[in-house]
Amino acid sequence: MNNISQIRRQLGITQRELAHHIGWGQPRIANYETGLREPSLGVAQKIVQALNALGAQVSIEDVFPFQN
C-alpha cells in the first residue's frame, strides 16, 4: 500500500487538486490511493514531485514504502 492519501490529507488538498497539479483526472489518483493501479517508477516520481510542490517534504520511500 502507499501513503498518497495520508500525505494529501495532511496537506489539506483534494484528489482533484493533486491530479490537476500533475495534469491527470481525479479518478487516476483515486485508483493509485486505493491500490487499484500500481504506479510505475516514473509515475511514482511525478506524484512525489507534485506532493512536494504542494507543500510536503517527502521522498519516494515515504510515499511508497517498500513491502515484502
Where are these regions (language model features)?
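A short, Lys/Arg-rich alpha-helix, primarily the initiator
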Residues: 1-10, 17, 21, 58
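Recognition helix of helix-turn-helix/homeodomain-like DNA-binding domains
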Residues: 24-39
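Short amphipathic recognition helices of helix-turn-helix/homeodomain-type DNA-binding modules
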Residues: 58-68
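DNA major-groove recognition helix of helix-turn-helix/homeodomain DNA-binding modules
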Residues: 42-60
